[in-house]
Amino acid sequence: MKVLTKAASAIGDGLVAGFVGTAAMTVSSTIEARLRHRAASTAPARATAKALGIRAFDSDLAQARFNDLSHWGYGTGWGVVRGILGAAGVPAATATAAHGAAVWGSAAVSLPALDVAPPFVFWGREEVAIDVLHHTVYAVATGAAYELIAAGRRNGGG
Protein backbone atom coordinates (compact mmCIF):
# COMPACT_ATOMS: atom_id res chain seq x y z
CA MET A 1 0.00 0.00 0.00
CA LYS A 2 2.89 2.36 0.73
CA VAL A 3 4.08 2.07 -2.89
CA LEU A 4 0.64 3.05 -4.20
CA THR A 5 0.47 6.00 -1.83
CA LYS A 6 3.93 7.17 -2.92
CA ALA A 7 3.02 6.78 -6.59
CA ALA A 8 -0.27 8.63 -6.18
CA SER A 9 1.47 11.43 -4.29
CA ALA A 10 4.15 11.69 -6.97
CA ILE A 11 1.53 11.87 -9.71
CA GLY A 12 -0.55 14.47 -7.87
CA ASP A 13 2.46 16.54 -6.88
CA GLY A 14 3.75 16.32 -10.46
CA LEU A 15 0.43 17.52 -11.87
CA VAL A 16 0.44 20.55 -9.58
CA ALA A 17 4.10 21.23 -10.40
CA GLY A 18 3.37 20.86 -14.13
CA PHE A 19 0.58 23.42 -13.81
CA VAL A 20 3.02 25.84 -12.14
CA GLY A 21 5.60 25.20 -14.86
CA THR A 22 3.00 25.77 -17.56
CA ALA A 23 2.08 29.09 -15.95
CA ALA A 24 5.74 30.13 -15.96
CA MET A 25 6.18 29.11 -19.60
CA THR A 26 3.00 30.98 -20.52
CA VAL A 27 4.39 34.14 -18.93
CA SER A 28 7.77 33.80 -20.67
CA SER A 29 6.26 33.07 -24.08
CA THR A 30 3.68 35.85 -23.75
CA ILE A 31 6.37 38.40 -22.89
CA GLU A 32 8.58 37.17 -25.73
CA ALA A 33 5.69 37.27 -28.23
CA ARG A 34 4.83 40.84 -27.27
CA LEU A 35 8.45 41.97 -27.44
CA ARG A 36 8.84 40.40 -30.88
CA HIS A 37 5.37 41.49 -32.07
CA ARG A 38 4.29 37.97 -32.98
CA ALA A 39 1.04 36.12 -32.42
CA ALA A 40 0.74 33.45 -29.79
CA SER A 41 1.69 29.96 -30.89
CA THR A 42 -1.10 27.78 -32.21
CA ALA A 43 1.08 24.66 -32.27
CA PRO A 44 -0.61 23.09 -29.21
CA ALA A 45 -4.07 23.25 -30.80
CA ARG A 46 -2.87 22.14 -34.22
CA ALA A 47 -0.94 19.17 -32.79
CA THR A 48 -3.73 18.07 -30.47
CA ALA A 49 -6.38 18.52 -33.16
CA LYS A 50 -4.35 16.49 -35.63
CA ALA A 51 -3.76 13.72 -33.08
CA LEU A 52 -7.49 13.62 -32.28
CA GLY A 53 -8.64 13.86 -35.89
CA ILE A 54 -10.24 17.30 -35.51
CA ARG A 55 -10.24 18.93 -38.93
CA ALA A 56 -11.69 22.37 -38.27
CA PHE A 57 -13.05 24.63 -35.56
CA ASP A 58 -16.35 26.49 -35.63
CA SER A 59 -14.63 29.81 -34.94
CA ASP A 60 -11.32 31.45 -34.11
CA LEU A 61 -12.52 31.70 -30.52
CA ALA A 62 -13.14 27.94 -30.39
CA GLN A 63 -9.64 27.31 -31.75
CA ALA A 64 -8.11 29.74 -29.23
CA ARG A 65 -9.91 27.99 -26.36
CA PHE A 66 -8.82 24.59 -27.65
CA ASN A 67 -5.26 25.91 -27.93
CA ASP A 68 -5.31 27.04 -24.30
CA LEU A 69 -6.73 23.69 -23.14
CA SER A 70 -4.12 21.82 -25.18
CA HIS A 71 -1.24 23.95 -23.87
CA TRP A 72 -2.31 23.69 -20.23
CA GLY A 73 -3.18 20.01 -20.49
CA TYR A 74 0.12 19.14 -22.16
CA GLY A 75 2.24 21.06 -19.66
CA THR A 76 0.28 19.92 -16.63
CA GLY A 77 0.36 16.31 -17.81
CA TRP A 78 4.11 16.34 -18.37
CA GLY A 79 4.46 17.28 -14.71
CA VAL A 80 3.64 13.64 -13.91
CA VAL A 81 7.00 12.65 -15.40
CA ARG A 82 8.77 15.09 -13.06
CA GLY A 83 6.84 13.65 -10.13
CA ILE A 84 7.83 10.10 -11.02
CA LEU A 85 11.49 11.10 -11.38
CA GLY A 86 11.37 12.73 -7.96
CA ALA A 87 9.63 9.78 -6.34
CA ALA A 88 12.22 7.44 -7.88
CA GLY A 89 14.92 9.31 -5.99
CA VAL A 90 16.54 11.01 -8.98
CA PRO A 91 18.42 14.08 -7.66
CA ALA A 92 16.53 17.33 -8.23
CA ALA A 93 18.89 18.91 -10.77
CA THR A 94 19.19 15.67 -12.74
CA ALA A 95 15.42 15.13 -12.68
CA THR A 96 14.79 18.68 -13.87
CA ALA A 97 17.32 18.37 -16.70
CA ALA A 98 15.94 14.98 -17.78
CA HIS A 99 12.37 16.27 -17.59
CA GLY A 100 13.21 19.37 -19.63
CA ALA A 101 15.04 17.31 -22.25
CA ALA A 102 12.12 14.89 -22.50
CA VAL A 103 9.54 17.66 -22.91
CA TRP A 104 11.55 19.60 -25.49
CA GLY A 105 12.60 16.43 -27.28
CA SER A 106 9.05 15.17 -27.54
CA ALA A 107 7.92 18.48 -29.03
CA ALA A 108 10.90 18.51 -31.41
CA VAL A 109 9.87 15.07 -32.67
CA SER A 110 6.06 15.17 -32.48
CA LEU A 111 5.41 18.57 -34.08
CA PRO A 112 7.22 17.71 -37.33
CA ALA A 113 5.75 14.19 -37.27
CA LEU A 114 2.27 15.73 -37.11
CA ASP A 115 3.24 18.26 -39.82
CA VAL A 116 2.59 21.13 -37.41
CA ALA A 117 6.10 22.59 -37.57
CA PRO A 118 9.23 21.90 -39.58
CA PRO A 119 12.04 19.98 -37.88
CA PHE A 120 13.96 22.30 -35.57
CA VAL A 121 17.10 21.98 -37.71
CA PHE A 122 15.31 24.27 -40.19
CA TRP A 123 14.24 26.90 -37.64
CA GLY A 124 17.35 29.04 -37.36
CA ARG A 125 19.46 29.50 -34.25
CA GLU A 126 17.43 32.30 -32.71
CA GLU A 127 14.14 30.40 -32.93
CA VAL A 128 15.70 27.23 -31.49
CA ALA A 129 17.25 29.24 -28.65
CA ILE A 130 13.93 30.91 -27.85
CA ASP A 131 12.09 27.58 -27.88
CA VAL A 132 14.72 25.97 -25.64
CA LEU A 133 14.50 28.99 -23.32
CA HIS A 134 10.73 28.61 -22.90
CA HIS A 135 11.01 24.87 -22.30
CA THR A 136 13.82 25.51 -19.80
CA VAL A 137 11.60 27.99 -17.96
CA TYR A 138 8.92 25.30 -17.86
CA ALA A 139 11.27 22.57 -16.61
CA VAL A 140 12.95 24.72 -13.95
CA ALA A 141 9.63 26.08 -12.64
CA THR A 142 8.10 22.59 -12.64
CA GLY A 143 11.15 21.18 -10.86
CA ALA A 144 11.20 23.94 -8.26
CA ALA A 145 7.48 23.56 -7.60
CA TYR A 146 7.80 19.79 -7.30
CA GLU A 147 10.70 20.07 -4.85
CA LEU A 148 8.79 22.59 -2.70
CA ILE A 149 5.71 20.37 -2.64
CA ALA A 150 7.75 17.26 -1.88
CA ALA A 151 9.68 19.05 0.89
CA GLY A 152 6.40 20.13 2.45
CA ARG A 153 5.15 16.56 2.31
CA ARG A 154 8.38 15.24 3.91
CA ASN A 155 8.06 17.82 6.67
CA GLY A 156 4.52 16.75 7.51
CA GLY A 157 2.68 19.28 5.38
CA GLY A 158 0.73 16.81 3.30
Language model: regions and residue ranges:
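Short amphipathic, positively biased membrane-proximal segments
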Residues: 1-158
